[in-house]
Amino acid sequence: MAEDKKKAPKDSFFKGVISEMEKTSWPTKEEILKYTTIVIVTVVFFLIFFYALDLGIGKLIELIS
């Protein structure tokens, strides 16, 4: 049954991990810089958008009250 199966040695696991890491295509430095810039610009855009929205709603509530 399940107890009868031999367990794979630890080095077999690490060899598998290394093998899979070698198959992975890693982004280049330029790609990382490009994607990081896109993320930062997007975050800043939404920061400004929601800040302006918050100010607008605050002023609207102030006018109503």
Swiss-Prot record:
Localisation: Cell membrane
Membrane topology term: Single-pass membrane protein
Pfam families in the cross-refs: SecE
GO cellular component, one term: plasma membrane
BP GO terms, sorted: intracellular protein transmembrane transport; protein secretion; protein targeting; protein transport by the Sec complex
Transmembrane segments: 38-58
Keywords, ordered alphabetically: Cell membrane, Membrane, Protein transport, Translocation, Transmembrane, Transmembrane helix, Transport
KW Membrane (keyword) present: yes
An example molecular function term from Gene Ontology annotations: protein transmembrane transporter activity
Name of protein: Protein translocase subunit SecE
Organism name: Staphylococcus carnosus (strain TM300)
